[in-house]
Amino acid sequence: MSSSKPTIAFFGATGGSTISCLAPALKAGYRCAALARTPSRLRDLLVQRGVSESTIADNLTIVSGTATDLQPVKQTLQMGRPASDMADLIVSGIGGKLIMSNPLSPTLDNPTICQDVVRNILTAIRELRDTGTTKAPFLITLSTTGISEVKRDLPIAMMPMYHWMLKVPHDDKKVMERLIVDDAERDPAARALGGYVIVRPSLLTDGDRDKGGDLKKIRVGVEEAPAVGYTISREDVGRWVFEHLVKKGRESEYAGKAVTITY
């Protein structure tokens, strides 16, 4: 593996979009760490995506735990090695499970999961910085369309469903995004992050990963001029993040922006 490749810490790695970024990163030789509640499940999912056992052993450190706990977040940022420096990049695709027991008021199993995890990531970086590291990781986080306060980024026909069924997760994502932007607006010396990209995919679907679709079909916009569409597959979200954000890192044209992606 080339030493020039950045190290990457993954949160929410068993989720469809995140693992679809982790798998190609491992195959390409990036050294990665991933936090997983059930490490064996993550390994199985990676093998299903064609990642060899030897590649997993060589390039991936799995930290057992949950991202709502600060200590395993720290361990993941340190690539699973207490004496090592922090990861260069962070990819976070944390999300909650939608609960429909009350159809009039859908919620999440943890209504503040996204903001809690990003808050933990920022806290962990600052605490690790106190131990002597000067590194400021670059954060790539998965959010959603339907929450922009600048311009409408979803079809009008989908607005009623989004504002009813997804109100709770959207409120959570808004706070998550605000935490990231607030950090970027601090004085440079006080920032936890060395930059960010917020990815806002349209409604996520379970596409066929074996077909390896052409990423050129994905339309891309920014908050001021969003790409408006109905759906995009989790698989293509992860692949797009790897090709256009992980590979370019801090040099990405989307650094410091909220990016919409859709078909």
UniProtKB/Swiss-Prot annotation:
Gene Ontology molecular function, alphabetical: biliverdin reductase [NAD(P)+] activity; riboflavin reductase (NADPH) activity
Source organism, top-level taxon: Eukaryota
Any one Pfam family match given in the protein's UniProt record, by short name: NAD_binding_10
SUPFAM superfamilies in the record: NAD(P)-binding Rossmann-fold domains
EC number of this enzyme: 1.-.-.-
Effect of disrupting the coding gene: Abolishes the production of pyranterreone 4, but accumulates pyranterreone 3.
Induction: Expression is positively regulated by the cluster-specific transcription factor pytR.
Classification via InterPro entries: NAD(P)-bd_dom, NAD(P)-bd_dom_sf, Polyketide_Oxido-like
Keyword Phosphoprotein belongs to the record: no
Keywords, sorted A to Z: Oxidoreductase
Pathway this chain belongs to: Secondary metabolite biosynthesis
Function: Reductase; part of the gene cluster that mediates the biosynthesis of pyranterreones, a family of antioxidative compounds. The first step of pyranonigrins biosynthesis is performed by the hybrid PKS-NRPS synthetase pytA that condenses 4 malonyl-CoA units ato the acetyl starter unit by the modular PKS of pytA. The acyl chain is then connected to an L-serine through the amide bond by the modular NRPS of pytA. A tetramic acid is formed and released from the PKS-NRPS pytA to give pyranterreone 5 with the help of the thioesterase pytI.
Protein family according to the UniProt entry: Belongs to the avfA family.
Name of the protein this chain belongs to: Reductase pytE
Organism: Aspergillus terreus
Lineage: Eukaryota, Fungi, Dikarya, Ascomycota, Pezizomycotina
